[in-house]
């Protein structure tokens, strides 16, 4: 179930201010954020946003297909190293 249309999409105020400031200055430097729950808006297209994954900031280049998704979807928090192979002999 999605968010109510009456409320509009969630985006952190600090992130919104940084994106608007860069759009006004026509600057495309990396924006660092911890807000994984923020929705990607059309004004963010072309920006590189470094999203925190719990350990480091993962750079995410925003494209047109990402609009409407959350920033956290593009910065995985878990690393899967594969299942352990069974030993040959067994019991």
Curated annotation (Swiss-Prot):
Domain of life per record: Bacteria
One Gene Ontology term of the molecular function aspect: structural constituent of ribosome
Alphabetized UniProt keyword annotations: Ribonucleoprotein, Ribosomal protein, RNA-binding, rRNA-binding
Cellular component, GO, one term: small ribosomal subunit
Segments traversing the membrane: none
GO BP, one annotated term: translation
InterPro entries, per database record: Ribosomal_uS19 (IPR002222), Ribosomal_uS19_bac-type (IPR005732), Ribosomal_uS19_CS (IPR020934), Ribosomal_uS19_SF (IPR023575)
Pfam families: Ribosomal_S19 (PF00203)
UniProt function note: Protein S19 forms a complex with S13 that binds strongly to the 16S ribosomal RNA.
Recorded family membership: Belongs to the universal ribosomal protein uS19 family.
Protein name (Swiss-Prot/TrEMBL): Small ribosomal subunit protein uS19
């Amino acid at each position: 179930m999605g968010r109510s249309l009456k409320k509009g999409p969630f985006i952190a105020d600090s992130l919104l201010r940084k994106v608007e400031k860069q759009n006004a200055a026509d600057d495309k430097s990396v924006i660092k954020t911890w807000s994984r729950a923020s929705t990607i808006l059309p004004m963010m297209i072309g920006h590189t946003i470094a999203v925190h994954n719990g350990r480091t900031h993962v750079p995410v280049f925003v494209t047109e297909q990402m609009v409407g998704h959350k920033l956290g979807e593009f910065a995985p928090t878990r690393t899967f190293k594969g299942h352990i192979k069974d030993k040959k002999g067994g019991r």
